[in-house]
Amino acid sequence: MFQKCEAIVIRAIDYGETNKIVTLFTREWGKVAAMARGAKKPSSRLSAVTQPLAYGHYLIRRSRGVGLLHQGELIDSMRVLREDLFAAAYAAYIVELTDKSTEEQKRNPYLFELLLQTLQYMSEGRDLEIMTFIYEMKMLSVLGIPPVLDRCARCGATEGRFSFSVKEAGFLCHRCESADPHRFPLSPASIRLLRLFYHIDLTRLGAISVKEGTKAELRAVLSSYYDEYAGLSLKAKRFLQQIGELKGTLDPGDGRNN
């Protein structure tokens, strides 16, 4: 029996000469895989709806393994994210993080909405790195590794100067900071943003402007925290790091990351 779902294509691989196997992150069932027969043919009605990042309604026959994709109706191709090198790199990281962090057929409508909203904001021209930071912060609860952000992770203090400790999985106050010689000193702006990004309702996100120095602090904290606790090996992360180095020497030209 074919069933209708709302989904985002988070992975697509070629299978044989004309077919694809697509991984869809659906609102209704979570992550599912489906065979798209003939989708590699440019003339196929499944060609556009099986492109990475495509968002639409799909009719599939589910199974315990790989199901069958019968048809799809495109809502948003997210084309702008595929055609810009920098946007494509950030979007690829977002969807791979989602893919590697979730189990097959485990429903999570909150995560679906988070992924959709993040990609839409990116396609609208929001700061790619800021949107990635927000997504990474929110994924920590999905992964079951939330940091302590509302108090000192050791003594519970809520006032004073704070740094971030990967070892203690959260903030350390100035009285406890000696517990981790490898802690990250943070500016007040970085502390506020880590808390904001973790708790913010994305549907109410306004304009956020962040200095490059603050971005560097956030980048270092999140990268180290994920390396320590997430246990994920992401190809897109390595590519994103290379893109970050390229950003230092080239102007992307569209103002996305300024």
Curated annotation (Swiss-Prot):
Function, as annotated: Involved in DNA repair and RecF pathway recombination.
Pfam families recorded: RecO_C, RecO_N
Keywords assigned by UniProt, alphabetized: DNA damage, DNA recombination, DNA repair
Record's GO cellular component terms: bacterial nucleoid
Homology family: Belongs to the RecO family.
InterPro entries documented for this protein: ARFGAP/RecO, DNA_rep/recomb_RecO_N, NA-bd_OB-fold, RecO, RecO_C
Protein name per UniProt: DNA repair protein RecO
Biological process (GO), any one: DNA recombination
SUPFAM superfamilies tied to this protein: ArfGap/RecO-like zinc finger, Nucleic acid-binding proteins
